Amino acid sequence: GADPGCQDVVTPVQ
């Protein structure tokens, strides 16, 4: 999506 933490367009910060 657009939140850092969800694997979408940014690095999946789990």
Curated annotation (Swiss-Prot):
Name assigned to this protein: Unknown protein 3
Keywords linked to the UniProt accession: Cell wall, Secreted
GO cellular component, as recorded: extracellular region
Chief localization: secreted
Compartments in which it is found: Secreted, Cell wall
Record bears the keyword Secreted: yes
